[in-house]
Amino acid sequence: MKDRIFKQDIGKQFEFDAQVASVFDDMLERSIPHYKEVLGLIVDFCSYTLESSKSAIPLVYDLGSSTGTTLLALSQALSTHTRFIGIDSSQAMIDKASLKAQAYNANIEFICTDLLEYDFLHSDIVIANYSLQFIRPMQRPALLQKIYNALTEGGILIVSEKMTSHHRILDRQMIERYVRYKQEQGYTKTEISKKREALENVLVPFSLEENIAMLKDIGFSGIEVLFKWVNFGTLIAKK
């Protein structure tokens, strides 16, 4: 279904409700630059990590799993002995993800809960695609520490985020380029403006430097930029 949510006034802050869940796949592909390329990189680096895993049944988490697209791609590419768990705070997203998994006969578990309250199991891989930016900034380090503690030695965290620049002019230019990208995907200026207003104080991005510093402070031994396009980036961090 095509994303037309912001063609009219929604009169509230952005939230991952049933209306958003119904068009979320289209919203992702039209709102996140090079979405499919990043997904392909995630599958590749998860595969590399699991090749050296010593876990009898490796565990992969997707935090903010939305409609399950990432875990579905991983389940089709990785060993059948891998356990997949998706966590999301939106029941509407969980319901849609579960239906997709059933349709593809994929063995994926989905849990509806708050990430900040969840007790992570020992895991080999944790993916957080465009989800940390919706966590209050002061709460992100504690969540990342829980993730780090649950990861096995050699395990990885993959983080994709919208990012800011500390340079005022460059930040404005990057925003302008992203607006142009969304227009190229068929969104109108009005839709773009309304969504930006709805996301105000809901999505709080960090800079690339801030994200890397936060991961270093947690204790990750290696952190690299896996992908970067203007104000979007994907990081991989190894324990």
Curated annotation (Swiss-Prot):
Its EC number is 2.1.3.-. Gene3D superfamilies: Vaccinia Virus protein VP39. Keywords: S-adenosyl-L-methionine, Transferase. SUPFAM superfamilies: S-adenosyl-L-methionine-dependent methyltransferases. GO terms for biological process: tRNA wobble uridine modification. InterPro entries: CmoA (IPR005271), Methyltransf_25 (IPR041698), SAM-dependent_MTases_sf (IPR029063). It holds the Pfam family Methyltransf_25. It comes from the Bacteria. CDD domains: AdoMet_MTases. It catalyses: prephenate + S-adenosyl-L-methionine = carboxy-S-adenosyl-L-methionine + 3-phenylpyruvate + H2O. The keyword S-adenosyl-L-methionine applies. It is an enzyme of class 2 (transferase). One of its GO terms (molecular function) is carboxyl- or carbamoyltransferase activity. S-adenosyl-L-methionine binds at residues 35, 64-66, 114-115, 129, 196. Homodimer. Catalyzes the conversion of S-adenosyl-L-methionine (SAM) to carboxy-S-adenosyl-L-methionine (Cx-SAM). HAMAP family: Cx_SAM_synthase. Belongs to the class I-like SAM-binding methyltransferase superfamily. Cx-SAM synthase family. This is Carboxy-S-adenosyl-L-methionine synthase. It comes from Helicobacter hepaticus (strain ATCC 51449 / 3B1). The lineage of its organism: Bacteria, Pseudomonadati, Campylobacterota, Epsilonproteobacteria, Campylobacterales. The gene is cmoA.
